[in-house]
């Protein structure tokens, strides 16, 4: 097989951008219009607040079909609009030729200048939810302004409506349609500004990558000059005068605001206080600035340089806070975000990391809500010498399991990172639960980090994941969730595509559009769940990745996106995609059920055993796509039921359906089984019907790869190794089946799993 030439992907992208630009330039030569002339007095004096509500919606062309010339011509003929009003306003004030003749930095300054000139007080408002609220003042005003007109409209059409409705509901529907369109446009505009600001002002990329952007811009400038010269027969002097961009009067007036990059950063990220987190080492050393790990670990007895802890915030520096923070980040390590309720899990996790011989530093991100006594418990678990081992250790050690560390397990380098002061006081109450994982991805001080939950169970050492081929290739490695047939509207995917970069973003600022690499994933086709965020691998220093982290945090505030997801899960990879960053990889397998196979005699009360094998477990496990068997990690702790301490066992014994071997047992036996370590002998990655349809059959085999059960506070899921069967009642009927992945582990692997489970629960 012939290997692709290095840089081929970049070359293809450059060619696509040049072709797209050439189409636009052909359009310029064919259609002449005065409204884009930058010296036109009307354009100079004309200002539009693109955030101002409007009830008319011109046809919008997304320009996403490979910059198709026919689409551009049709759009132009019908008074076309760009996907984002940010560009619509820019090209009302300036000709396309004059803008494309600018350098990259000039384009950045012009666009920001143009945005602020339309609304001097522009700021991204985290308090704006974009939610439809029928009790709001806005809705009352809408009724006052539009009520009479809508009443007349309703009287005309009410008898022809497919579904009968009241006037009140009709007005609500009309309000929802209008506001939804407005909110959608406003979100598109805000995300466009966010991407452009990050691309222009947040350091991102190596010199080679920046040189590539410069070459693209230079090629565009050559095409602009050539196209205009050929179309108009103008001299070089005439052409130079034409292409010279002139600022509007409003743009001239906001020079000071545009040149103040620190203030610009505060406009885009007002929820960030511009203060660094507070870093506290296990030994009591503290820092108001990201610690330099190379310096600290070089000589533990050498005092640290005082100047690194003297800077309280970034306002003493003219540069943008986020650039300072990115530049100060260093090293690689493990990151987790916890509160007081996660302390026990964190202690168990640290014991597990010691058993895995982890030597990477650990940053525990918190929001001013961990007590000193809890810190002391964590430090004790991380630092005290371990002399006792579970009985299962001997069996594993003598079995020559290579992953078991020598005795004693190494102490852990634990840091506590308080991010409370890094969030503006007026916005602190906007963050809750899963949001802190997104903040942890931003405010940890590592260049490379593994973000995990307190109840994440690693079955490989952390270094294994940093060395994984998928992570090494992309600097962003993710894992898929379970794949039950829980669906979402197809319109969710269509909405997300609109939120991504358009071709004009790509032409103007080299921000790539979404491709089928993203849009062909199951979430865009209607699957409810896609990513499991219990373990996330990201390298901040890779091109665009830091900006993608910023995007995923910003998406949290955009409720039409965040509220359609399950917690934080999907915001990680969608933050990448919406940022124009598809340099990420997923493990190919969806999550597995891990544990022990259900015995045939207990399966569905059938006389004939099912072909499909079953595992009922509360733990989503992740099987390597490199060998289709290695268990890499799983979630929900190492007890059989992570909710063991929160269950009414009297009720559990009465309502038990799937764990029939426990029927008739005393509730205390139930509790012991739930509290003991999960024993793993098998794993099942269920099949997924590509049409997301159940496979009904006459064999009474499972129709779906997953079923949810009430056990373990409804955290229990049963997985099946195959689905489908006979499509008719006759024995000879055609069979439609799908097989998943069934893994049976060796005695050595099972012994190793048992050892790690005993370590995690503290079974010594």
UniProtKB/Swiss-Prot annotation:
Pathway: Protein modification; protein glycosylation. Its main location: Golgi. Belongs to the MNN1/MNT family. Responsible for addition of the terminal mannose residues to the outer chain of core N-linked polysaccharides and to O-linked mannotriose. Implicated in late Golgi modifications. Induction: Expression is regulated by SEF1, SFU1, and HAP43. This is Putative alpha-1,3-mannosyltransferase MNN13. It is an enzyme of class 2 (transferase). Residues 35-764 are lumenal. GO terms for cellular component: Golgi apparatus; Golgi membrane. It comes from the Eukaryota. It is a single-pass type II membrane protein. Residues 1-13 are cytoplasmic. The chain crosses the membrane at residues 14-34. Its EC number is 2.4.1.-. It holds the Pfam family Mannosyl_trans3. Keywords: Glycoprotein, Glycosyltransferase, Golgi apparatus, Membrane, Signal-anchor, Transferase, Transmembrane, Transmembrane helix. GO terms for biological process: mannan biosynthetic process; protein mannosylation; protein O-linked glycosylation. It is found in: Golgi apparatus membrane. The gene is MNN13. InterPro entries: Alpha_mannosyltransferase, Nucleotide-diphossugar_trans. Glycans are attached at residues 45, 204. One of its GO terms (molecular function) is alpha-1,3-mannosyltransferase activity.
């Amino acid at each position: 097989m012939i290997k692709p030439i290095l840089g081929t992907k970049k070359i293809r992208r450059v060619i696509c951008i040049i072709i797209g630009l050439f189409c636009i330039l052909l359009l310029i030569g064919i259609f002449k219009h005065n409204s884009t002339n930058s010296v036109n007095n009307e354009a100079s004096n004309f200002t539009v607040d693109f955030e101002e509500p409007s009830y008319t919606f011109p046809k919008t062309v997304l320009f996403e079909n490979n910059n198709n010339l026919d689409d551009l011509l049709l759009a132009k003929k019908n008074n076309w609009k760009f996907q984002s009003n940010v560009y619509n306003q820019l090209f009302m004030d300036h000709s396309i030729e004059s803008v494309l003749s600018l350098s990259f930095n000039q384009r950045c300054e012009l666009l920001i200048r143009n945005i602020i000139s339309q609304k001097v007080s522009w700021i991204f408002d985290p308090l704006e939810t974009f939610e439809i609220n029928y009790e709001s003042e806005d809705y009352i005003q809408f009724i006052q302004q539009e009520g009479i007109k809508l009443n007349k409209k309703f009287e005309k059409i009410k008898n022809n409506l497919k579904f009968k409705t009241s006037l009140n509901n009709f007005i609500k529907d009309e309000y929802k349609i209008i506001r939804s369109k407005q909110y959608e446009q406003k979100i598109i505009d805000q995300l466009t500004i966010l991407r452009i600001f990050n691309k222009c002002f947040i350091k991102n990329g190596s010199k080679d990558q920046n040189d590539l952007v410069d070459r693209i811009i230079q090629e565009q400038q050559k095409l602009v000059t050539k196209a205009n010269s050929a179309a108009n027969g103008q001299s070089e002097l005439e052409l130079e005068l034409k292409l010279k961009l002139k600022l509007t009067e409003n743009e001239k007036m906001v020079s000071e605001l545009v040149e103040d990059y620190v203030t610009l950063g505060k406009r885009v990220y007002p929820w960030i206080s511009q203060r660094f987190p507070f870093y506290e080492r296990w030994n009591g050393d503290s820092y108001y600035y990201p610690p330099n790990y190379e310096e600290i670990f070089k000589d533990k007895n050498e005092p640290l340089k005082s100047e690194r802890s003297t800077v309280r915030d970034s306002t003493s520096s003219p540069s943008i806070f986020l650039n300072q923070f990115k530049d100060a980040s260093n090293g690689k390590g493990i990151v987790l975000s916890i509160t007081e309720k996660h302390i026990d899990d964190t202690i168990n996790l640290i014991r597990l990391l010691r058993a895995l011989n982890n030597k990477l530093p650990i940053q525990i991100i918190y929001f001013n809500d961990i007590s000193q006594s809890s810190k002391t418990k964590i430090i004790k678990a991380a630092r005290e010498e371990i002399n006792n081992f579970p009985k299962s250790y001997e069996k594993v050690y003598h079995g020559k399991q290579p992953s078991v560390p020598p005795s004693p397990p190494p102490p852990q380098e634990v840091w506590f990172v308080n991010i409370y002061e890094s969030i503006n006081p007026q916005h602190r109450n906007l963050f809750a639960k899963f949001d802190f994982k997104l903040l942890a991805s931003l405010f940890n001080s590592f260049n490379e980090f593994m973000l995990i939950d307190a109840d994440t169970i690693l079955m490989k050492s952390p270094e294994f994941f940093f060395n994984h081929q998928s992570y090494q290739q992309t600097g962003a490695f993710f894992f898929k969730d379970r794949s039950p047939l829980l669906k979402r509207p197809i319109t969710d995917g269509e909405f997300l595509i609109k939120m991504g970069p358009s071709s004009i973003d790509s032409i103007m600022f080299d921000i790539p559009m979404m491709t089928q690499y993203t849009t062909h994933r199951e979430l865009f086709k209607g699957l409810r769940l896609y990513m499991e965020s219990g373990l996330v691998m990201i390298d901040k220093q890779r091109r665009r990745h830091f900006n993608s982290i910023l995007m995923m945090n910003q998406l949290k505030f955009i409720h039409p996106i965040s509220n359609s997801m399950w917690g934080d899960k999907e915001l990680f990879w969608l933050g990448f995609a919406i940022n124009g960053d598809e340099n990420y990889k997923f493990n190919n397998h969806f999550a597995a059920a891990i544990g022990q196979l259900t015995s045939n005699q207990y399966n569905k009360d059938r006389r004939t055993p099912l072909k499909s094998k079953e595992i009922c477990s509360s733990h989503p496990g992740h099987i390597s796509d490199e060998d289709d068997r290695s268990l890499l990690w799983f979630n929900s702790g190492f007890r059989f039921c992570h909710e063991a301490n929160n269950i009414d066992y009297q009720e559990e014994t009465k309502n038990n359906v799937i764990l029939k071997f426990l029927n008739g047992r005393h509730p205390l036996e139930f509790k012991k089984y739930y509290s003991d370590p999960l024993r793993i002998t098998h794993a099942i990655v269920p099949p997924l019907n590509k049409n997301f349809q159940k496979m009904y059959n006459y064999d009474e085999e499972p129709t779906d790869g997953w079923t949810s059960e009430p056990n373990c506070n409804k955290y229990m899921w049963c997985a099946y190794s195959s689905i489908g069967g006979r499509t008719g009642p006759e024995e000879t009927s055609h069979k439609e089946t799908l097989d998943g992945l069934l893994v049976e582990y060796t005695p050595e692997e099972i012994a190793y799993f048992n050892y790690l489970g005993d370590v995690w629960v503290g079974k010594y």
